[in-house]
Every structure is written in structure tokens, then in C-alpha cells.
Amino acid sequence: MEPLKHECGVAMVRLLKPLSYYQEKYGTWMYGMNKLYLMMEKQHNRGQEGAGMACVNLEAAPGSEYMFRERAEGSNAITEIFGTVQKKYKDYSSAQLNDVDFAQRNLPFAGEWYMGHLRYSTTGKS
């Protein structure tokens, strides 16, 4: 067996209830994305080369976009990808952002399945 090293990290969040449940219970439909951020930050360590996140909207209408991804390089990649996602929401009013139905139909990264990846260079060759 090989000795343990800092390998790449993976985090996944699968929401089992509709986004409206999380809006009502926690005050935001972004509950899954917030949990993914927290899980990725807990894995954040030195040697990080980059990170990425993906989201799947399982309730998307036929023909509409249902998969989203964002990637970044560098030691602050986690902050960068989540900041980029938040910038996509700046053109929407707070009423639109708090409307679960609007969010799920129109906003990127509004979905039920999230996955994050952290890439490390301390495991060997890049």
C-alpha cells in the first residue's frame, strides 16, 4: 500500500428535495451550492493547482440548459469559481433571486446536483 499523500479532492452534494424546500427552511435555494463551497474549503490545502465545480438542474425543461460548470487555476481557485458564479447573478433583482421557480428556469447553477474538484500538485508530476 502506498503512503497517504495530498491527492485531488472531490465533493458532491445531491439535494433530495425540491429547491423550494431549501428556500423555505433555510431562506435560500442556494443551500446546495453553499454546502459545496464549505466542503471544498475544508479540503483546501497548500499545493492546490486549481478547482472546478459543476451543477445539474434535474428539473430543467426539455431543450433548456441543464448542466453548468466553472473552472479556475491557482491557489485561490475556490474563491474565484464561486465569485464568478455570484457575478452571474448581479443583473437580477433580489425578488428574482428569491423566486425559486424563476431561479430554476433562468439562472445558471440553480440545480439539485453539485460536484466540486480540487487539483493538487503535491502527488507527483503535474
Please report, for each region that a protein language model flagged, where it lies by residue.
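N-terminal glutamine amidotransferase
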Residues: 1-126
